[in-house]
Design a protein with these regions (language model features):
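Flexible, glycine-rich active-site loops centered on histidine and acidic residues
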Residues: 84-121
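A short glycine/serine-rich beta->alpha loop
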Residues: 1-3, 37-38, 61-65, 110-112, ...
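Conserved beta-strand elements of the Class I
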Residues: 30-33, 94-96, 204, 266
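Claisen-condensing/thiolase-fold acyl-transfer catalytic domains that form or cleave C-C bonds
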Residues: 12, 39-40, 44-45, 58, ...
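Conserved active-site "lid/cap" helical segment
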Residues: 1-30, 43, 109, 158-204, ...
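Short beta-strand segments
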Residues: 66, 95-101, 127, 267-270
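Condensing-enzyme catalytic core mediating Claisen C-C bond formation in acyl metabolism
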Residues: 1-6, 109-183, 270, 283
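Glycine/charged-rich beta-loop-alpha catalytic/anionic-binding loops adjacent to active sites
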Residues: 30-34, 52-66, 106-108, 225-233
């Protein structure tokens, strides 16, 4: 983060850019969904209401989904479900979805397990049920599942209040067991096909969570796709930006000619909460 910057100011600026690109005015915004772990300056309020305040948007829904690296796609699911409810009432709505983390502030700079992997950043997208909207993608399907009961200690961030009550005076930093994360990510990949109900990914470009290049490459045989159908540039260029990773990847490929080669996009993410979330987008 630069001088005077924090996650809220980055999210505000990203939201403004997303609205401009979508041709949407602030007055048309029905609410803000966000996905952020406790990496902002406050545990409460969360990212969504703080961004709403920065944008000077009043009397709107502001909801945060804190589900680790899967949170961005899960927040998209929450937003999608809200739009379904709005449509059922005959209401046209437009929401901003911002997702990301200032994750460097909770890393141990001497830990090679985390310090060289994670990055700070934010993404923003506009989601609407407006039948007159043009460009962008249609959300065909979203789904998610939780596996946290299996092994919570794979990735965790201790609660500073609980640590203080236990007599600890040290910093509460992110803890990760890399082997456990890798095993979960590779084991859960076949389940993604079941969640989206698709067996043939020939028409798809796949944007997985950018956590580990070996884990990402495991999707090639699992989905029976070609290497050029798989996005890997996030982890190699900017690192793991938590719930923003899939959306930053989507923005990245939209500026490339290869994006025109595929009619469908698969977003698949998994995260610290041992959650998996998927979304199918089409043109």
């Amino acid at each position: 983060m630069g001088p005077g910057e924090n996650l809220v100011t980055l999210a505000r600026d990203a939201a403004r850019d997303a609205l401009k690109n979508a041709g949407v005015e602030l007055s048309q915004v029905s609410g803000i969904f966000s996905s952020c772990n406790p990496t902002t300056d406050y545990l409460m309020p969360t990212l969504a209401p703080m961004v709403a305040a920065k944008l000077d948007i009043k009397h709107v829904l502001a909801c945060n989904v804190g589900m680790g690296c899967a949170g961005g796609v899960q927040a998209l699911q929450a937003c999608f479900n809200q739009l379904l409810a709005d449509s059922a009432r005959g209401k046209v709505s437009t929401y901003i979805l911002v997702t990301g983390d200032h994750i460097s502030r909770m890393l141990d700079p001497e830990s090679w397990k985390t310090a060289i992997l994670f990055s700070d950043g934010i993404s923003a997208v506009v989601v609407t049920n407006n039948p007159e909207a043009t460009g962008g993608f249609v959300i065909e399907h979203v789904a998610s599942e939780c596996y946290a009961g299996e092994e919570v200690a794979v990735i965790n961030l201790p609660n500073p209040l609980a640590a203080r009550e236990a007599g600890s005076t040290g910093p509460c930093l992110l803890q990760m067991r890399g082997r456990g994360v890798f095993e979960f990510g590779t084991r859960i990949a076949p389940r993604v096909k079941e969640l989206v109900g698709i067996t043939n990914f020939e028409e798809f470009y796949v944007i997985p969570h950018q956590a580990n290049i070996r884990m990402i490459n495991e999707l090639i045989p699992t989905f029976d796709i070609k290497p050029e159908q798989l996005y890997v540039d996030g982890i190699t260029k900017i690192g793991n930006i938590s719930g923003a990773a899939c959306f930053l990847g989507l923005e990245d490929i939209m500026s490339r000619p290869l994006a025109n080669n595929y009619d469908k996009i698969l977003l698949c993410a998994f995260g610290a909460e041992l959650q998996v979330a998927v979304a199918v987008l089409s043109r």
